Amino acid sequence: MYNMVSLFIVAVLLLTYANVEGSDVTGGFPVNSNNCIYPCYSTQDEIQCEEFCEKLNGRLGYCRRDACYCEHLPESVKQITNSKTFDCSNGPWDLSTV
């Protein structure tokens, strides 16, 4: 019984540490000049999102809430950090509109 309790406590501590470590990752949804997000639904979109984020000097890109999300984007990149504020969706993935 003591071993089970000890294991549970260690697991909770590890999960808490992992959650705290992940909470300071900055990122956002890149937008074009019209504040439109880039849609992201499928595996192909996710690959495109990852490449797009790298071009924007972010480290990781993936689909989140049906939009392209980039982690570690520079502050100079226009982005939305609150996913509740999507106004429109951009069709083509075009860096010239960022």
Swiss-Prot record:
Give UniProt keywords alphabetically. Disulfide bond, Ion channel impairing toxin, Neurotoxin, Potassium channel impairing toxin, Secreted, Signal, Toxin, Voltage-gated potassium channel impairing toxin
Q: Which residues form the signal peptide?
A: 1-22
Sorted alphabetically, the Gene Ontology cellular component annotations on this record are: extracellular region
Q: What tissues has this protein been observed in?
A: Expressed by the venom gland.
Pfam families noted in UniProt: Toxin_3
Query: Which domain of life does the protein's organism represent?
Result: Eukaryota
List the subcellular locations.
Answer: Secreted
Major location, coarse class?
A: secreted
* InterPro entries linked: Scorpion_toxin-like_sf, Scorpion_toxinL/defensin
Which residue stretches, if any, does this entry annotate as coiled coil?
Answer: none
- Keyword Secreted assigned to the entry: answer is yes
For this chain, one GO molecular function annotation is: sodium channel inhibitor activity
Q: Does the keyword Signal apply?
A: yes
Disulfide cysteine pairs (residue numbers): 36-88, 40-63, 49-68, 53-70
Read off the domain note. Answer: Has the structural arrangement of an alpha-helix connected to antiparallel beta-sheets by disulfide bonds (CS-alpha/beta).
The family classification in the record reads: Belongs to the long (4 C-C) scorpion toxin superfamily. Sodium channel inhibitor family.
Biological role: Probable sodium channel toxin.
Quote the protein name from its UniProt record: Probable sodium channel toxin Ts27
